[in-house]
Amino acid sequence: MKRLLGLLLAMMVMMGGMAGAQASTDNASMQLIRMNPLAFRKEPVGLYSVTHTPNGSFVVIYFAEGEKTELQEMWMELFDSVGTSLLSAKLGEFDPNGEQIPHGQIILKKDRFICEYYPDITSMEVCTQTVYRYTGKRIQKPTTKKLKFGAAPYAQHVGDYMVEKQAHSEDETPFRTVKITHIASGKSKKLMIYDWSFCACSDQDGNLLIGQQNEKGNLEIRSYNAAMQESIVELSGDFLQNSYISDAACIGQTVYFDIYLTNQQSEILFYDMKQQNITDSQTLHTANDNSYIAEIKAAGAVLLSVDGYWNRELQRQKYQINLLNEHFETSRLPLQHESCLYIFTDVEQADVTTIEMDEKSHSYFVCSYSISAGE
C-alpha cells in the first residue's frame, strides 16, 4: 500500500522579529523568511489535508471535537497567503469509533474551487459539493448527489494540474481510470493507468509527469503538457520486482523516482528526460529506525527527503525535512518548532512552506524558509 504523507496542516500571521533568523548544518543553510500564527475556527484534533491554490491561498481540512462528546467534526477552512482566515465551514460530523469515516477533498479550477465531502470513505457513494471563489465567497450552495460505487475519485493537486484517481473498483479490468486537468485552461484528458500506486510530479516547464509499472512489468513514464499532448517512454522494469514506485520529484532534466524497498529504505533512480534513460541510482535511508520515508521533494535545485513518524504523546503524525547531498547522505534541516505537520515546496525556487505546531501551547504556525546547499 502506498505510503501516504497524510498532508496535515495549520497556518500564519507575521512575527517580524523572526524573519532573517538563520540556522545551518554542514551541508545546508535554511533561513526563515516569515512565520505567521494560524487561528482556526475550532481547535484541530488532527489535520486531514492541505491544498495550495493558484493565488497563493490554501485550504485546510481538519478534524475538531463535536458538540456531542462522542462525536468529531470535519471542517474546511480557507486561509490567504499570510494566514488570515477567509472562510470556514463545517462539512459533517461522525463517530470516530464507528464504521463510517469521512473523506474531504478540494478540486481546484481556474477561478474557483470545489469542496467535496464524502460521509463514508469506504464506499464514497454519497458526495456533497460546495463551490467557492478563492476570495472565500460561496458561489454555489451545497448539493448532495449519489454516485455509483467506483465513480468517485481521489483528488490530488500536482503543480499546474489536478489528478483525479478512481477511488474504488469492482470491475474485472486491472486498469484505473484517471482524469488529469490543466487548472488554468480547463483542458483535461482521461487515462487508463495499470498501476494503482502510480506517482505524479511536475517538471520546471509546467508539464505533468506520471510514473507507473505497466502491465508488462516495465517502468512507463508519461508526460503531458497544458494542451494534453502525450509522450510515453517505456524502460525495463527489472528493478521493480517485488516493489513499486512510491514517489517522484523533478529538478531540471532529471526525474528522481523513489522505488520502495522497506519503510526505512528506498532506491532512487535518476531518469534523464533528454536521454530518456536511467543514468544513475542511489540508496536513501531514513535518519533513524523509528521513522519511514514519507516522500521526496524538489525545492528549486535542492532535493529533499521527508521522514515521517508518529508522536504517541500528541497522537499526531510529524515530519522531518532532510537535505540530500550528491551521495544521498541526509542533513536534517532545523525548523522553528519541533512538530512539523505539513510541507510544501516550490519546484522553481528553493523555498519551503511548513505548518508547524508549538507542543506546549498547541498553537499553529505557517513558516516559510529559503534553502541553500552548503559548500
Regions flagged by a language model, labelled:
Residues 154-158, 163-179, 190-221:
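Solenoidal tandem-repeat scaffolds enriched in leucines and small polar residues
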Residues 341-375:
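Blade-level signature of beta-propeller repeat domains, shared across WD40, Kelch, NHL, RCC1
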Residues 1-6:
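Positively charged n-region of N-terminal signal peptides that target proteins for export
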Residues 39-71:
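Beta-strand-rich domains and repeat architectures in extracellular enzymes and scaffolds
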Residues 43-52, 96-109, 146-159, 193-204, ...:
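Repeated scaffold domains used in trafficking and secretory/extracellular systems
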